[in-house]
């Protein structure tokens, strides 16, 4: 499978690069994607939610009224869960939402996400990102040249590049990350994925 290679001016270089079929050309596995995204979203949760149960409420323990004959529900003290301001029954407690996911499943999910992008013509390969200094204007110009300025953009670099990161930081819908941080959720959430030629080589090393 071959795709055209562009430069950051949006010009076709006349060269093509071959995408690895075992990564970019597989039949996407939706269940693997679901599990990987579920784990990612679960790991974003702080898990610090907490409500007070009956033993944790401070207040009088005097019984409000007689047990029978009042015509209403039986209730004890002011901390009763049936009263406004009372305790909560089986309320949330601090917990860790992490769950284990096998490495093979995560790898399959990432391959599936990238394959979806290829199937939807939402993957662009560029020669390289050469930003001499952090400049938002240059990054915006690049998105316009590639005709992706109106889409959520994910730029995947082979390694960290401070100039590119800082140039894209203030642009809504633009996200920059390295191959080592390749993430199924972010790939799927992007309207277009932009890779460099070196990024493709790095992805081959990680996902094969």
UniProtKB/Swiss-Prot annotation:
The gene for this chain is rplD
Which residues does the annotated region (Disordered) include?
44-79
How this chain assembles, per its entry, is:
Part of the 50S ribosomal subunit.
Function (record text): One of the primary rRNA binding proteins, this protein initially binds near the 5'-end of the 23S rRNA. It is important during the early stages of 50S assembly. It makes multiple contacts with different domains of the 23S rRNA in the assembled 50S subunit and ribosome. Forms part of the polypeptide exit tunnel.
- Domain of life assignment: Bacteria
This protein is called what? Answer: Large ribosomal subunit protein uL4
Extract the InterPro entries matched here: Ribosomal_uL4, Ribosomal_uL4-like, Ribosomal_uL4_dom_sf
Q: Which HAMAP family match?
A: Ribosomal_uL4_B (MF_01328_B)
Keywords attached to this Swiss-Prot or TrEMBL record, sorted alphabetically, are: Ribonucleoprotein, Ribosomal protein, RNA-binding, rRNA-binding
Give the family from UniProt.
Answer: Belongs to the universal ribosomal protein uL4 family.
**What biological process terms from GO does the record include?**
translation
Q: Which GO terms describe its cellular component?
A: ribonucleoprotein complex; ribosome
Q: Name one GO molecular function term.
A: structural constituent of ribosome
PANTHER family linked to this entry: 50S RIBOSOMAL PROTEIN L4, LARGE RIBOSOMAL SUBUNIT PROTEIN UL4M
